[in-house]
Amino acid sequence: PGWSVLPAQVSLYPHFLIHISVNQNGEKAPENSMLYMASLQSKGGHVCGGFLISEDFVMTAAHCQVNLTRVVLGTHNIKNVDEGKIRYIEKMYKHESYQNVGTGKDIMLLKVTELNNKLQTIPLPRSEIHLGDNTKCYVAGWGFIKTGGGVVNELRVVDVSVINPRVCREMWGGVPDNVICAGGYKTKKGFCQGDSGGPLVCDGTAVGIVSFNWEKNCNYPDKPNVYTDVSKYLPWIKTILKRTKRSE
């Protein structure tokens, strides 16, 4: 299939990686909103998005495990980052069954160094969820705002609607288990290169993780954007969080 997950620095990584950039036809996020958003960075700058779920854990996509060195939190502008917004990655917990975006389980937790200041977190679903067709949600990130563009410095956000799973499977010719489809189909709204790993937020809850779109093209109205369904991995998430608490 033509799914693609390209990191922001496309030329540096294998063609099958999909680091998506939210905000095909999005707008700048309001100041002081969504401060749970994380910019996952390598020495070359922004690679993927993520989101803070506890004081020392960031959730992102498994396919974002590409030379990551640090996480920037609590800011909209990633150009001139205050040292107090930077956390370093202590350990990565990629889902043990992850192979590639096409087979699913595209989820990863990052244990990050703790800082003194408390930062905003975003809640996860409490139990397994089933979103209704056309549920309005939004996705945010620092990714490209058009095909072939570049990473943006200011966080951008776009609203997207949930797509019926059957329609999504038909349009893709099959998708992995445990995913949510929203945006990118019969609309110009959706994510693009550089947004991978960021959250799909519905009613204030992080229900999905940006996983893949169609090839390197964000200007397509015929392939739904695909997200990992966080609610299907709650037992795995709880196991990781408990394990690290015990070892401290």
Which positions does each model-derived feature cover?
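Conserved active-site neighborhood of the chymotrypsin/trypsin-like protease fold
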Residues: V58-A61, T103-S127, E154-V157
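Conserved, non-catalytic sequence blocks in retroelement Pol enzymes and Pol-derived host proteins
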Residues: N25-E31, Y98-G102, I129, G148-V151, ...
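Protease-domain processing segments flanking chymotrypsin-fold serine proteases, especially trypsin-like
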Residues: P1-M59, T69-T75, N80-G84, T239, ...
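Conserved H-D interstitial segment of serine endopeptidase catalytic domains
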Residues: L40, V58-N100, N117, V158, ...
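A structural micro-motif recognizing beta-strand termini
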Residues: Q41-G44, K111-N116, R126, G183-K186
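Extracellular trypsin-like serine protease catalytic domains
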Residues: M37-Q41, Y138-E248
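Active-site substrate-binding loop(s) of clan PA
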Residues: E96-Q99, E114-V152
